[in-house]
Design a protein with these regions (language model features):
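Acetyl-CoA-dependent GNAT
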Residues: 2-4, 8-82, 90-99, 135
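Terminal substrate-recognition subdomain of acyl/acetyltransferases
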Residues: 144-151
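Conserved GNAT acetyl-CoA-binding A-motif
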Residues: 100-111
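Glycine-rich phosphate-binding loop
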Residues: 87
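Structural preference for long, well-ordered alpha-helical segments within the folded cores
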Residues: 95, 120-121
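A secondary-structure capping/hinge motif
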Residues: 129-132
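Conserved beta-strand-loop-alpha-helix junction that forms the acyl-donor binding cleft
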Residues: 84, 109-119, 135-142
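Conserved active-site tyrosine of GNAT-family acetyltransferases
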Residues: 122, 127
């Protein structure tokens, strides 16, 4: 696929992002527990940047970079199920890597262990697994968080 446009998320993108998130949740159980207010969940206060991937003027992906003390974390990374397998997730991830480097912040992320495609993406992109933490909120879907740091 040709590179998609990665741009800041606009207010008018939020309903589409919620719709895509719902489709991801229904297909892949992400997030494991559906948020009470998905629009708010997609707009954390600690955000350093919120971006969408756009292809043919359609939002097809989403990612947030949040502050974590002096470091940064990748959060809320998802791609429209109709657009998976085209490298969009990797482009969004790379945008976060580039932005965190420009801000001189170390970068990490956490992913639940049921997200095989996401774990594969992070490993292929050179991210390093740095730990695992048991969780009690994953129900039958997941039992631990896997922590990765950017290369």
């Amino acid at each position: 696929m040709w590179p998609v446009l990665i741009r800041e998320r606009h207010d008018e993108d939020l309903p589409v992002c919620v719709d895509i998130l719902r489709a991801v949740h229904e297909q892949a159980s992400y997030p494991i527990n559906w948020p009470t207010d998905p629009a708010r969940w997609l707009t954390p206060e600690a955000a350093l940047g919120i971006w969408v991937a756009v292809d043919a003027e359609q939002v097809v992906g989403h990612v947030i970079l949040t502050a974590a003390g002096p470091a940064a974390e990748v959060e809320r990374l998802f791609v429209d199920p109709k657009a998976t397998g085209q490298g969009i997730g990797r482009q969004l991830l790379q945008h976060c890597v580039t932005t965190a480097a420009a801000l001189d912040r170390d970068l990490s992320l956490e992913v639940v262990d049921n997200r095989g495609a996401a774990v594969h993406l992070y490993r292929r992109a050179g991210w390093l697994e740095t730990g695992r933490t048991p969780i009690d909120w994953g129900g039958e879907h997941a039992s631990e968080l896997i922590r990765f740091t950017a290369p």
